[in-house]
Amino acid sequence: MSFPNPDGQKKLDEMYTKLKEHLSDERIDLLRRYFEATNNFYQIITLKRLFRIINSQNSETYTEDDFLAYAEITRHERHYFEIYGLDEIFERQPESTPINRLLIHESLLEYNDYAELYSEKQGRAYYVPEKEVLLKYEDEFYCEQTPQFLAMREFCTKNAKKSDDEVIEDLLFAILFNVKCEHSSPFDALEFINKFSVQLDVNKKKFPELIRLYCELHNNTRNPFLNGFTPNEWLQRTGDETDSRYLDPKDF
């Protein structure tokens, strides 16, 4: 059994007290929401870029000192992200200044996937949603209700041998999570269907439709590897199917 660290909590309280000399509780909470939302949306982002996004979307801007003071507080709290400098996660890197540290999703550190995603992000432009949309991603289970997502939901619901809305939603979330991964494939959808015991009636005749729906969902879902762009959007920008991570149903 673990017990709270009184000294650690005392330090946190002192840090918050100092920050509240400059920021209201409401403005501190807004920072928290941005940290959580961008963590889920981008999975890796520099504090410098996050700082820029926040100030671009709010008329009452933050000073860099206050922003970094809050970032330092989060390093001593429990979140689904960690903040590290490049020198702390990669070899032979110069020491990072606080503003150049990375906000990294916890799952990437847990499965040691951060290096691949960090590499893929380099040199790409960033898609930044409007403030109201971006902050919806504070909820790690938020799913943008795109036409492609709704079409996949309709397919799963229509072909379920027994209706179980909760299980179908779990299946859809698993599929949506998968389309954002490095090696996304429509065959993963079949694996999830079996795993979640949805008992979909997907015969040989319906399998091409599942492949098409999966590829359309993949190509129209905002992807952290593409810094928030969808594969379709990145393909339109570059004309490069491979670099855009575009999936063509004819390839399966």
What are these regions (language model features)?
Residues 124-249:
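Extended alpha-helical interaction scaffolds used for oligomerization/partner binding
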Residues 20-46, 154-157:
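Positively charged, polyanion-binding regions of nucleic-acid-associated proteins
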Residues 32, 36, 51, 64-72:
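Short, well-structured alpha-helical segments
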Residues 57-95, 188-225:
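Charge-enriched amphipathic alpha-helical scaffolds
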Residues 2-17, 22, 26, 68-135:
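Charged low-complexity interaction tracts in eukaryotic proteins
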Residues 39, 54, 58, 71-75, ...:
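Hydrophobic, Leu/Ile/Phe/Ala-enriched alpha-helical segments that form helix-helix packing faces
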Residues 44-55, 62-65:
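Short acidic, hydrophobic short linear motifs in intrinsically disordered regions
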